[in-house]
């Protein structure tokens, strides 16, 4: 938590308080040659099932906090995770290039995110962040790394480059005075969660 900031929002009013800057560590996913493709596909399937379970728990949490309509964000994530084109692209990369699942998921996620980002429709462009969120969670489960815990311990203004829906729903909204997102989109699922979260004031 850093210095104090004053935020004025034309929709919600003014927030004054300490600043909590959230920084994400960008880990490089290495390309590793694998001999046993079948084992790699099994790893992928196991990580996918774990990811689906996590998304189901996030849905339940969001359902209690922001209602069914906004909780459906995490049902959409489950559908996107199981999307045939997305899964086929990952499988094909593992099988055809003998690469590790983490690398295949990372590259496929980037490709699909770029595809959405270049679409003309604002809503579809905002889905780019959803693909990245899903892919990052899948990679974390493959590598055995825990997703970062963005627990805020005191009331503060949250400043971040961007937030994923899963990061947003895990925060204690009663300790958030305001959000400042550098690359946030008004059409993103994160924005939907922020706008419908209970006000701390």
Where in this protein do the model-derived segments appear?
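Non-catalytic, soluble scaffold/interaction modules
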Residues: 3, 8-193, 197, 201
């Amino acid at each position: 938590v850093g210095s104090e900031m004053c935020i004025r929002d034309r929709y919600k009013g003014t927030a004054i308080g300490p600043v909590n800057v959230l920084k994400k560590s960008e880990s490089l996913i290495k390309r590793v040659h694998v001999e046993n493709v079948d084992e790699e596909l099994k790893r992928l399937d196991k990580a996918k099932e774990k990811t689906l379970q996590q998304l189901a728990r996030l849905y339940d949490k969001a359902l209690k906090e922001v209602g069914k309509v906004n909780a459906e964000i995490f049902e959409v994530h489950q559908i996107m995770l199981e999307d045939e084109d997305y899964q086929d692209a990952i499988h094909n990369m593992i099988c055809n290039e003998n690469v590790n699942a983490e690398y295949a998921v990372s590259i496929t996620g980037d490709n699909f995110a770029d595809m959405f980002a270049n679409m003309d429709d604002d809503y579809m462009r905002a889905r780019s962040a959803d693909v990245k969120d899903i892919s990052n969670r899948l990679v974390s489960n493959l590598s055995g790394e825990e997703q970062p815990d963005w627990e805020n311990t005191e009331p503060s203004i949250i400043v971040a480059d961007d937030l994923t829906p899963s990061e947003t729903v895990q925060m204690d909204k009663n300790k958030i005075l305001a959000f400042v997102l550098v690359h946030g989109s008004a059409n993103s699922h994160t924005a939907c969660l922020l706008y419908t979260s209970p006000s701390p004031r």
